[in-house]
Regions:
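Intrinsically disordered, low-complexity acidic/Ser/Thr/Pro-rich linker and tail segments
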Residues: 2-79, 84-85, 97-99, 109-112, ...
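A short beta-strand motif characteristic of beta-propeller blades
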Residues: 45-51, 87-92, 141-146, 184-189, ...
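WD40/WD-repeat beta-propeller blade N-cap
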Residues: 50-57, 93-101, 107, 146-153, ...
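Loop/turn segments within WD40 beta-propeller blades
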Residues: 61-66, 104-120, 156-161, 200-210, ...
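Hydrophobic beta-strand positions that form the internal "hydrophobic ladder"
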Residues: 69, 123, 163, 213, ...
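Conserved strand-to-loop turn within each blade of WD40 beta-propeller repeats
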Residues: 72-75, 126-129, 166-169, 216-219, ...
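WD40-repeat beta-propellers
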Residues: 78-81, 132-136, 172-177, 222-226, ...
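Short coil/turn linkers that define WD40 beta-propeller blade boundaries
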Residues: 86-87, 140-141, 180-183, 230, ...
Length: 764
């Protein structure tokens, strides 16, 4: 995977981080014993039969001023990412009925730079159900909404606090969004005979009181409007005689040019002042779905793509006022639904392949010409999988210690599986549904250590279920009127701990009495919880927030203490009960270890005050830590979506990490050209419809036997980066010598992607 530059880590402001530069000594006896210590292995169980397919990206919206972006997916979920370190800071499941098409981040004005991020932004979406929604970042639920009387909203575009919406009934509408109330209609324009599929404000380089905007229609026409008077200033008919041409996307440049992408794969460039088509590009074989401008009035250019995933770059030659094609590149294999320009160096794309693709630009072009290599583009893919854990394990549920339960949280239900560790086979048991009448998707879930209790949270409810393994029977016991972002059970399953960022409280539930025993208030300022962990021995909770704070909750004493931490996001937290410490991973993958009794950094941490104290290639490593697996008091594994790293606190850190690449066996090795060729054969076959697609998916995931893999070797190479698995969803110890790895096979996922060319008819 190719890499893009990342910002340097912020230095900690904490005084405890400012200790001596000298490394903690390791005595000769310890060194000798370390060298003599034989390599030992962990028996590895590898689960690959549990399907976890991410949803396609519908739209991406960047906010460069705050180094964040928002994206929405086809399953209605919404995510916010940092764009300098690529941490998924917010993800909430959305509502089933709010199938989103567009997302927008609004940067509030007159907010101090020192204010928390949550106070600086507002998040809006629109979709085919006809609602414009502002979301509460704390509750993960709609905060305010506007119901469009014209039905489906195909597109929206903001200018200050005014939102233009593309209505299904052909009527352009303008909605005002206020700070603490529902959006409301301020203007309604003349209705047309065709649906409006795209809207666009005029991008003017001259300040004027007159605001202009454009609408693209389902019959191929384009209209220019005066916002103040409501008059139609210009109507352009599509040059083709085909009335079924759809104008999916538009982009205004310098008050003079309007770029339009249509369903035939053409990019139309109009001189909008005279209503003249000045250029036509036919680089695509299917619909153009997204156009984005570089925003430079002196050297205008634009990027466009769509169902045919080729990304093209066109520029205006200012000497002769002619638009020319300068570069093109295919960075993703399937449909691209959205482009967004991060800055002059990076172009983002997202679509059917579910990941965020970062394309490196060279002077605005998609590739750089070298002396020996031409058409070379540096790109990087950001994994689509949620950073929050979605797989939960029970202890052994039988005296023979052969079987454990696995709870898999999906979008609107949970799957329960059983794993036999002797045969390494996983068997599907049951589905756990929330209240089907409720429109919300599942926010969090967990299973008790004994496997007899399951909880899941949605909307403002957390439901408790019992599970009888002998009868394979699930019963709902009670609904608690509390929203839970994280759920934990005590080791004896007598209590449940619900952590809610909406109310900023921890609710302790007595399982036998089915009532709330305690409510522990968190910090006064409500905040987004980035990551959280639970100590099964002390019932303590540790969590980090979006405002870059870390807290430790003693649920017995009902005390909350601040944990020492660097001045940056803490993306992962883990209790190490073997030595009573807390492991913190920051957004740059640097490691901090806190001694819990003293609430101070350990000597191992205070001796490493700079990024230069860590291996060079580890510091430059861009995969983010998804989880931490404790092996012993001094050894733990860090795992990402692609690989894992062994950390041994008793050994010196190498100057450079060894990298062990995957020795691909027959199962893992993939002929990507064959996969893509088969895919394109399917999508051009008119008989390849939903029924066939379902059959292929079922064939893919029907097998319950899991792949065999060599045991994980814990040798003397500290900080070794190992690539042995496919996408890692979970790594956890199920006994002293056995490691469980839940992974996704990306090849299976690719084969189940829907065909790009068989785009569903609009309106469906």
């Amino acid at each position: 995977m190719n890499k893009t530059p990342s910002k340097k880590s912020n230095k900690s402001n904490n005084s405890s981080r400012k200790s001596s530069k000298s490394k903690s000594p390791i005595n000769k006896e310890q060194q000798s014993s370390t060298k003599q210590k034989a390599t030992f292995e962990l028996s590895t169980l590898r689960i690959n039969s549990i399907e976890n397919t991410p949803s396609p990206i519908e739209h991406i919206c960047c906010l460069p001023s705050l180094s964040i972006l928002a994206l929405c997916r086809s399953d209605s979920s919404i995510e916010i990412w940092t764009t300098n370190t690529w941490i998924q800071v917010i993800k909430f499941p959305g509502l089933k009925s709010l199938q989103t098409r567009r997302v927008f981040l609004y940067h509030k004005k007159n907010v101090p730079d020192s204010a928390p991020l949550i106070n600086k932004i507002r998040l809006f979406t629109c979709g085919i159900n006809g609602y414009l929604v502002e979301w509460s970042l704390l509750s993960n639920l709609p905060k305010f909404s506007y119901k469009n009387p014209g039905g489906c909203i195909w597109d929206m575009q903001f200018k200050d606090k005014i939102c233009l919406i593309a209505s299904n009934d052909g009527t352009p509408r303008a909605v005002k969004v206020k700070k603490s109330s529902n959006p409301y209609l301020i203007k309604q324009f003349a209705k047309s005979d065709s649906r409006i599929l795209s809207v666009c404000w005029e991008n003017s380089t001259i300040k004027t009181k007159t605001r202009l905007f454009y609408t693209g229609h389902s019959n191929g026409t384009i209209c220019k409007w005066n916002f103040e008077t409501g008059q139609t200033l210009l109507t352009l008919s599509n040059p083709s005689a085909d009335n079924d041409i759809l104008i999916w996307t538009m982009c205004s440049i310098n008050s003079k040019y309007l770029l339009c992408g249509d369903s035939t794969g053409k990019l139309l460039v109009y001189d909008i002042n005279f209503g003249v088509l000045v250029k036509e590009f036919k680089e695509h074989t299917a619909d153009i779905l997204s156009i984005v401008s570089n925003g430079n009035p002196n050297e205008p250019s634009a990027y466009f793509t769509g169902i045919d995933s080729l990304i093209c770059n066109v520029k205006l030659n200012t000497k002769n006022n002619e638009w020319i094609l300068t570069s093109s590149f295919r960075g993703q294999s399937h449909d691209i639904n959205s482009l967004s320009l991060l800055n002059e160096n990076y172009l983002l794309s997202g679509g059917i392949t579910t990941d965020i693709c970062i394309n490196h630009l060279y002077n605005g072009n998609m590739y750089q010409k070298y002396e020996k290599k031409i058409n070379t583009n540096v790109k990087r893919h950001i994994s689509p999988f949620e950073h929050k854990q979605n797989y939960y394990l029970s202890d052994f549920i039988d005296s023979s210690k052969k079987n454990i339960l696995i709870l898999h949280k999906k979008h609107d239900y949970c799957d329960l599986w059983i794993l036999n560790i002797n045969s390494n086979t996983s068997t599907y048991l049951a589905k756990i549904y929330k209240n089907k009448k409720n429109d919300s998707n599942i926010l969090s879930a967990n299973i008790s250590r004994d496997g007899k209790l399951i909880m899941l949270s949605y909307d403002d409810i957390t439901s408790l279920f019992s599970y009888d393994y002998d009868k394979n029977e699930i019963k709902k016991i009670k609904e608690f009127k509390h929203q839970s972002n994280y759920i934990f059970f005590s080791s004896d399953s007598s209590k449940a701990y619900l952590l809610s960022q909406k109310t900023s409280k921890v609710y302790i539930i007595d399982i036998n009495a089915l009532k709330v025993l305690k409510e522990i208030s968190l910090n006064k300022d409500k905040d987004i919880i980035l990551t959280c962990d639970f100590n099964y021995e002390s019932n303590a909770i540790a969590y980090s927030t979006l405002s870059k704070q870390v807290y430790y909750i003693d649920t017995v004493k009902e005390e909350i203490n601040s944990v020492p931490h660097p001045d940056c996001f803490i993306s992962k937290i883990k209790f190490n009960t073997k030595n009573n410490t807390l492991i913190l991973i920051d957004e740059y993958n640097l490691i901090y270890i806190v001694d819990i009794p003293t609430m101070k950094f350990t000597q191992w941490t205070t001796d490493r005050i700079e990024k230069t104290d860590f291996p060079i290639n580890y510091v430059k490593w861009y995969n983010k830590i998804y989880g931490i697996t404790i092996i012993s008091k001094d050894v733990f594994l860090l795992y990402t979506d692609y690989n894992y790293i062994k950390v041994d606190l008793t050994k010196q850190l190498p100057k450079e990490s060894l990298i062990e690449k995957n020795k691909m066996d027959k199962y893992v090795k993939s002929d990507w050209e064959k996969i893509i060729k088969e895919f394109h054969q399917k999508i051009f076959d008119e008989e390849y419809k939903g029924k066939e697609y379902s059959k292929i998916r079922n064939d893919m995931f029907s097998s319950t036997s899991n792949k065999k893999v060599p045991d994980i070797s814990l040798d003397n190479d500290n900080f070794k980066i190992v690539s042995k698995f496919n996408s890692i969803m979970l790594m956890d110890m199920i006994n002293e010598n056995t490691m469980l790895v839940v992974e996704n096979d990306w090849n299976k996922i690719v084969k189940t992607f829907p065909g790009g060319v068989i785009k569903p008819n609009y309106g469906h």
